[in-house]
Amino acid sequence: QKIYQDKSALNFSWYQKEPKFSLELIRSAKVATNDPIIDVGCGASVLVDHLIKECFTNLAVLDISANALASTKNRLGDSANNIDWFVADITQFDAPNKFSLWHDRAVFHFLTDHRDRKNYVKVLKNSLRTEGHLIIATFAIGGPEKCSGLEIVQYDSEKMIAELGDNFELVEERNEVHITPANKEQKFIFFRFLK
């Protein structure tokens, strides 16, 4: 949370001008434009801007940082009124409804304590509809070992499947080399699961 007080969103290593892989995987999921979608750990990401442009109308965003969400709200202007905003710790989130698609780029890998990961998966299972889509991206094996001074956990498909358990079927995975605003390379891995 403090990270967003100290930096502009454009300076975060995970910042993307266009969330290409996320958008491609969301399109692959073929959810209806009025299906409920949540972007977990959205921070100051522009994914929600792109989803609005693609006519998705039932959007929710969640972040632990009120500052990050305020920045995104300001950027969106009047469009922000049509989005559900949640300032919450995802490991303790109580969703008011079930989602058809859950998107997380770069939150799960910050959960270094197995209890936090277990709680995240519990919230995920309770919040995602049967036949719902999970799109989750983390640092890949061989990627960064820390991010913004924080420890992370690297993943491959085997590790991610072990974390999520039997309720989720891996549909698709993609590797990305993300170029940070400081022009450094970071290895990410994206997964799309079906519940």
Q: What residue spans do the PLM features occupy?
A:
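Short catalytic micro-motifs in class I SAM-dependent methyltransferases
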Residues: 106-110
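A conserved beta-strand element that flanks and buttresses the S-adenosyl-L-methionine
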Residues: 103
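Conserved acidic residues
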Residues: 100
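Class I (Rossmann-like) S-adenosyl-L-methionine-dependent methyltransferase catalytic domain
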Residues: 1-97, 111-127, 133-195
